[in-house]
Amino acid sequence: MTEYKCSTQPSSSNCRTKYRTYITAIKSKPFLILAGISGTGKSRIVRELARACWDVDSNEYETQKPRNFEMIQVKPNWHDSSELIGYVSRIGADQNGNGISFVVGDFLKFIAKAWEEPDVPYFLCLDEMNLAPVEQYFAEYLSVIESRKVDREGNVVTDPILKQNAQSWYWNLCTELTDDEKLRAQFRDKGISIPQNLIVVGTVNMDETTFSFSRKVLDRAMTIEMNDVDLYGGLTHRYEQIGKVSSEHLVGNAVEGVDVYESNKDVCDVVINYLQEINKKLEGTPFKVAYRTRNEFLLYIVIISRIIRMILARSYL
């Protein structure tokens, strides 16, 4: 297994302090929820982080929608994953099953695009994701995100979000999703899984028109509340002045506490002792800190401690 020792060394020194929280959270886990009052720029932040992955003089930086960004507006009538991933259609098929096809959802298309460009972070923004029950329309992703693990080559892999199938419709689907023959073969042999460079960010407004989140969803995501507003923000520059953000900033190569503990025992032990004290206070309740929360604490602290050391050395900002 590749040793993970706070490996957040950026490729540039221009990241702004304002975005450090978002970048660190994403690197800790590529599923982020931005919650707050309406109009605070939650979806804009996602778009600007995607834009910041490109050089300022490139076409992707100047365009309204960089190719590594996709926004999907959640609809209140979503109760399964057919709008996001897709569904098998039997329209036009005969009794023997000939002519069955797969209607591809935008999320699955974007997954394939991210696989084609593994060195570029790809951002999917689910806008107002709690307009519908997240546990229903996003069930496959919520399950698969928990299957993440580091393989022998040091890559983060997941179970397939769409399993391999021997039927002709699946073969045709793989052909439709990508022109890359190697990637087609991977999809056909192993199914379609979540690439390491795919970052999912949901924006949330809490009001009487939305659904509340279950613990299942909150446990699986990094959550940031956005209720502060700078009324001078965005008046002097068309785009956010983030600086160049590379894959090294955003794509993590650790998933569990075991991936970071041995190389960072000093800081990890401080975190564990703190969490143990919390659990003592929560004894006898169903709210004690468990392994998933512990792991995410460790990953976040290891990453942010590395950033702080670089700031003190003036090599990050």
Predicted regions located by residue number:
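Alpha-helical lid/collar subdomain of P-loop NTPases
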Residues: 237-317
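AAA+ P-loop NTPase catalytic core and its hallmark functional loops
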Residues: 1-251
